[in-house]
Amino acid sequence: MKGLHKVIVQNNRLHYEFDIRRNITIIQGNSATGKTTLINMLRQAENLGADSGVDVNCDVPCRVLEGRNWKVILESISKSIIFIDEENVFINTEEFASAVQNSDNYYVLITRENLYDLPYSVEEIYGLHSSGKYQNTRKVYQQMYRIYSDKNILPIKPEKIIVEDSNSGYDFFRSVSEDQNLECESAHGKTKLFDLLQKVDTRQVCVIADGAAIGAEMNRLSAPAAMISRWRSWRTSTPAKSATGRSSAAT
């Protein structure tokens, strides 16, 4: 299954509308933002049909996958958008990751966990928010927003480049870095980026990585940066010379 699919899920109180672009989409966010409600509405529509009071509009079937028999159920589903809530612990397993990569379905995973076995794009990590649409009615209009923007201006002038790749990509950025008198180092894989960042001194660092597969690493790479910087500032007792932050750039 390929291409973009628009999904609309609504009843007399709630209206969800969003586009699914890739085979793996992640929805994150705090409690009470409407994530579980979306799953419940889809489940009601699937089990009760028109009697549920829920309308699901999409050009492909939308299904909810859950429970201990998930693998057996998944084998019978094809060319559908499958929604899975975070209470289903199987989404963290290698077995599930293998099943996802060998199927023709799209998957919408509602979880705050980092799913390291799945290669999902940083551009397909979303949150949910209520928009101003329908604000004069009783219906709440829910839309998705990207957590990590695809347009960023680096707030620093990097003194060191760390590249996820160790092959031609690294060779390119090493050549560019040499021209700019910058140090360039390969992490030899996305899973080693975080550990390498922790070993860097107070220099400003720019990370170059493949945005199409680094989604699971983004929480670790972005959130701790300021904390690491503050800790180094305290350790050296030279706040004015410490880094003000570390930026991660996805290409």
Descriptions of predicted regions:
Residues 83-85, 104-114:
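Structural recognition of the conserved hydrophobic beta-strand(s) that form the central parallel beta-sheet
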Residues 33-35:
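Conserved glycine(s) of the Walker
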Residues 67-94:
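Conserved P-loop NTPase "ATPase switch" module shared by AAA+ and STAND
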Residues 1-16, 136-139:
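N-terminal pre-Walker A segment at the start of P-loop NTPase domains
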Residues 27:
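Hydrophobic anchor at the beta1->P-loop junction of P-loop NTPases
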Residues 38-40:
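Post-Walker A alpha-helix
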Residues 88-89, 122-251:
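Acidic, divalent-metal-binding catalytic cores of TOPRIM
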Residues 44-55:
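Post-Walker A helix-loop "phosphate-sensing" segment adjacent to the P-loop in P-loop NTPases
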